[in-house]
């Protein structure tokens, strides 16, 4: 990754030989973005998208080497504020577009060295792994980075030695759908096999079943992309365990988490799959220069002002980009907003719905508590000294099928024996009008027993909640799970690796909706959970008993400190005085507070369920 300077001559970028630790991720700015944000009221430019007019770094706009404007804020329904710093052209003269041919020519030497080095990497990985895997494939998303990754790969490898795979989430921008169609035809013309994978559910169905995805409850990528792709490739190219190299357009500068990726890794997404990121160290400057130099397809969404192309409604999307999305695709965005409000259990009367959507309240849910669902958990554990008693809504043989992924199950004359890691437990089941009961011999608090309870809860989650999203099928590294016609089958070849049981809460659907009604019934549960408590607030209050963070945060802080026993009616208690003397730098202070917090509804629920 190279540093760059602004080039007044071309209005573009000029790479230099200095290495840059962190890119500012520059991107070209076309007239459509200027129109959407309202710059057309102040600047004169032709409505021509054959070339950009300027560049942006985050919210700052650069024209021929000068910062001429910036934007602030913006929400789903409110345009960002424009801050005009200086006139791009004197006396209102028309803006001059970036001279792309000259910019490309001036960057040729440095860019070509980077490109050739990347092509060699791809070829060397191919040589090293071609006898170890069933297939090489480029994971294509329709974004600029995957366009570049694909072009690099097709230059490095024979066209019959890799596939292109598009995971259709049914939530893409319309511009992505258009680009994928063009790219598919181009691949066909060049002898490259282009494949598409999709979930057996539409996005409308999945959002209504799982509830809208959130930052901490992101079922969407697995259900709509990763699992369908792995299952499709396994069915098509593998006889048993799939071994493959997935070539991506992932770049380290896209996010903090991606900056920690290794260029080559094994099993990070799915077991049996190597992930190779050939352009991991490329910056967006190099990406755009390569696209322009090769005349590659560019998703029109970038011309509207997006720095990344993903789904129409994403919990990780910024407020500014949500505004642009709604300006570009109003009907689609409003459709997803309706799904969000229809599934929320919050009071969204009056202006509450608009505020909820504008502030991204839907993005912060941690469980099913905030969803409009009306059922208790379908299984519960009541532990006695003699038995682990699992009550279930409906007793079916499905739990015995899933138990085969955990250990051996034997039935003889009504007696059930369960084996886990060479330890056998007696089991019995019964059923009445209220549901079913599975009683398992309690063998104490050994490591084996703790693991047994954890994994058996996953077995019950699958048996009670499975909606056949097929994530478990994809998670099995040996392809020993199959689902068809509403039935789950576990092969006798299952090696009990437990990968399928380690899915969040045992089942993505259960993980998304769990705790819905049970948590709604707990008074005081929402005193501080939806906003969260900053430890610095507590530290500051203990240092200065008059400290308040302001607005709703103050209520949240006092709610937490009331539960912790520090204050009562916003006045310091004797316990609070003790904590003040000890100070929050003493870990014992927090331990004592947690002793009090353990009796509150939120912490009670966490202790018993998590």
PLM-predicted stretches and their roles:
Residues 254, 259, 263-282, 418-474:
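A broadly conserved sequence feature marking short terminus-proximal activation segments
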Residues 303-306, 482-493, 497:
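Short linker/helix segments within small regulatory modules
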Residues 514-610:
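Donor-sugar nucleotide-binding helix/loop cap in glycosyltransferases
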Residues 331-347, 490-505, 514-519:
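Short microdomains enriched in Cys/His and/or Lys/Arg
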Residues 2-286, 290:
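ATP-dependent adenylation/nucleotidyltransferase module used to activate substrates
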Residues 1-94, 98, 299, 304-458:
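ATP/NTP-dependent adenylation/nucleotidyl-transfer catalytic domains that generate, transfer
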Residues 284, 293-300:
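Extended serine/threonine-enriched, polar tracts that run as long, contiguous segments within proteins
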